[in-house]
């Protein structure tokens, strides 16, 4: 039980700005086991946002609430995944060789492509969530972050790291297939309950396809994965999921 709590808190500490203030075991095995809790943490964040939406929907217009929810997400996660998307776009669209792309991705300064990617990402999320709320599909506020994190877990099944060192290396190739299978089944069951089997299957397949295509792009550009590409994958997974929901 103690190890389970350790791994759960480790995911909160690593992926959010929530102050855990606890000395935790941070070995690779802890991150391997803790991967189970990554979608769980996402569902908790999404659940809080959903409650905020329910609490405000009688007082504020939905478009204002969605902006506040996006702001809340950025604050509680530190913009971790969006930053990964921005860094990835800065590097990949620079049209340089592998070593230079990785150097650009490591640069803390945001370039033109990263800025454009972040703006488009936020605009898409805003419009998609706003449109889904108007369609009485506000449950997407909870489900999208979960699916995004699951896309990260599938990407991490690869052992291809683009750098010798990096925060992403503690996850890349350090995944347990039974854990991913279990958390995927739970997520699919939850989605089926709220969305129905047809939408669940189509949206999940679409996210897997986008994840795999993005993986091929990473291999082509930098011959592997980094922490930034994991964050980018999360954003792509969420956007894909929301797009499918709106189309259905």
UniProtKB/Swiss-Prot annotation:
The chain crosses the membrane at residues 36-56, 59-79, 113-133, 137-157, 170-190, 199-219. It is an enzyme of class 2 (transferase). Pathway: Cofactor biosynthesis; adenosylcobalamin biosynthesis; adenosylcobalamin from cob(II)yrinate a,c-diamide: step 7/7. The keyword Transcription does not apply. It holds the Pfam family CobS. GO terms for biological process: cobalamin biosynthetic process. Its EC number is 2.7.8.26. It catalyses: alpha-ribazole + adenosylcob(III)inamide-GDP = adenosylcob(III)alamin + GMP + H(+); alpha-ribazole 5'-phosphate + adenosylcob(III)inamide-GDP = adenosylcob(III)alamin 5'-phosphate + GMP + H(+). Keywords: Cell membrane, Cobalamin biosynthesis, Magnesium, Membrane, Transferase, Transmembrane, Transmembrane helix. One of its GO terms (molecular function) is cobalamin 5'-phosphate synthase activity. GO terms for cellular component: plasma membrane. It is found in: Cell membrane. PANTHER family: ADENOSYLCOBINAMIDE-GDP RIBAZOLETRANSFERASE (PTHR34148:SF1). Joins adenosylcobinamide-GDP and alpha-ribazole to generate adenosylcobalamin (Ado-cobalamin). Also synthesizes adenosylcobalamin 5'-phosphate from adenosylcobinamide-GDP and alpha-ribazole 5'-phosphate. Belongs to the CobS family. This is Adenosylcobinamide-GDP ribazoletransferase.
């Amino acid at each position: 039980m103690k190890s389970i709590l350790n791994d759960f808190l480790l995911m909160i500490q690593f992926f959010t700005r929530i102050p855990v203030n606890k000395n935790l075991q941070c070995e690779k095995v802890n991150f391997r086991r803790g991967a189970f809790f990554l979608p769980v943490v996402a569902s908790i964040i999404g659940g809080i946002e959903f409650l905020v939406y329910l609490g405000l929907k009688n007082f504020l217009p939905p478009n204002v609430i969605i902006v506040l929810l996006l702001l809340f997400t950025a604050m509680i996660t530190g913009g971790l995944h969006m930053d990964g998307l921005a860094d990835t776009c800065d590097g990949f669209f620079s049209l340089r060789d592998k070593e230079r792309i990785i150097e650009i991705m490591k640069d803390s300064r945001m370039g033109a492509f990263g800025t454009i990617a972040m703006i488009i990402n936020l605009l898409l999320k805003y419009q998609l969530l706003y449109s889904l709320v108007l369609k009485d599909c506000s449950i997407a506020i909870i489900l999208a972050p979960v699916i995004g994190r699951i896309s990260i877990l599938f990407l991490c099944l690869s052992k291809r790291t683009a750098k010798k060192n990096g925060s992403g290396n503690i996850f890349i190739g350090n995944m347990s297939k039974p854990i991913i299978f279990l958390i995927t089944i739970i997520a699919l069951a939850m989605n089926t309950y709220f969305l129905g089997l047809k939408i669940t299957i189509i949206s999940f397949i679409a996210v897997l396809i986008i994840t795999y295509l993005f993986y091929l792009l990473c291999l082509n550009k930098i011959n592997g994965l980094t922490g930034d590409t994991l964050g980018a994958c999360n954003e792509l997974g969420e956007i894909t999921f929301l797009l499918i929901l709106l189309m259905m």
